[in-house]
């Protein structure tokens, strides 16, 4: 398989965000998914970082744009811009720090306040490799996810456990939600078929929301270089 690059053509682009307290491992989850790297010297994110990875959905290539922001309160001013246009979110806590789990509902409230109500959310208990230091049991994560209608996985960015699965669960569910909405809107409008773009390859939606009706979601190889930094005033 040829290596991905940022410039590789894609059929669709959508945005997802990583949220949770500082130092829960958001940046390393992003680095593992986008570049298959783990940074032992990872430092707190300043402002916003985002990375890309191409995902095969049937015969289409979707470029997933994953955003990571600092968990510190002093960066809360970027909130509305950060969530705008997001179709999915990984809501992350550290299984070795009870406070990060206790703050999950605060982050979920903020997400639901600023993001689209149809945003797909996966609850992620990260650092599962640190079992001996666990403060949050796996069943607690499952119970919270069930009560809030979220998906749930425990991950280890260090050991690369369930990282791919967490992102692909989110991407697959985004496809289902958007496809169902397209079908419902077309039925309400009396349209026989979805509006097709210029090359006849897919359904046209606002930027970041173009998904086609297929049933297979697989990721390509991680990008060799995909991170970018930006800040909002």
UniProtKB/Swiss-Prot annotation:
Q: Which GO terms describe its biological process?
A: protein transport
Q: How does it sit in the membrane?
A: Lipid-anchor
Residue sites binding GTP per the record? 20-27, 68-72, 126-129, 156-157
What's the superkingdom here?
Eukaryota
Key words of the record:
Cell membrane, GTP-binding, Lipoprotein, Membrane, Nucleotide-binding, Prenylation, Protein transport, Transport
The record's subcellular locations are: Cell membrane
This chain's function reads:
Intracellular vesicle trafficking and protein transport.
Q: Which family does it belong to?
A: Belongs to the small GTPase superfamily. Rab family.
Protein name as it appears in the record: Ras-related protein RABA6a
Native species of this protein? Arabidopsis thaliana
Q: Which gene encodes it?
A: RABA6A
């Amino acid at each position: 398989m040829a290596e991905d690059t940022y410039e590789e053509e894609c059929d669709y682009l959508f945005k997802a965000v990583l949220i949770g307290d500082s130092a829960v491992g958001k940046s390393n989850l992003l680095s593992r998914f986008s570049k298959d790297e783990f940074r032992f010297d990872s430092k707190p994110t300043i402002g916003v970082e985002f990375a890309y990875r191409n995902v095969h959905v049937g015969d289409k290539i979707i470029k997933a744009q994953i955003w990571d922001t600092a968990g510190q309160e002093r960066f809360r001013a970027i909130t509305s811009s950060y969530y705008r246009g997001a179709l999915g979110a990984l809501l992350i806590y550290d299984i070795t720090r009870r406070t990060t789990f206790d703050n999950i509902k605060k982050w979920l409230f903020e997400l639901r306040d600023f993001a689209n109500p149809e945003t797909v959310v996966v609850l992620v208990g990260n650092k599962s490799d640190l079992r001996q230091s666990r403060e949050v049991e796996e069943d607690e994560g499952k119970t919270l996810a069930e009560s809030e209608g979220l998906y749930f996985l425990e991950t280890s960015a260090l050991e690369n456990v369930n990282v791919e699965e967490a992102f692909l669960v989110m991407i697959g569910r985004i496809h289902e939600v958007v496809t169902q909405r397209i079908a419902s809107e077309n039925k309400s409008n009396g349209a026989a078929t979805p509006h097709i773009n210029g090359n006849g390859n897919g359904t046209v939606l606002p930027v970041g929301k173009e998904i086609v009706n297929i049933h297979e979601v697989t990721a390509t190889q991680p990008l060799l270089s995909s991170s970018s930094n930006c800040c909002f005033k």
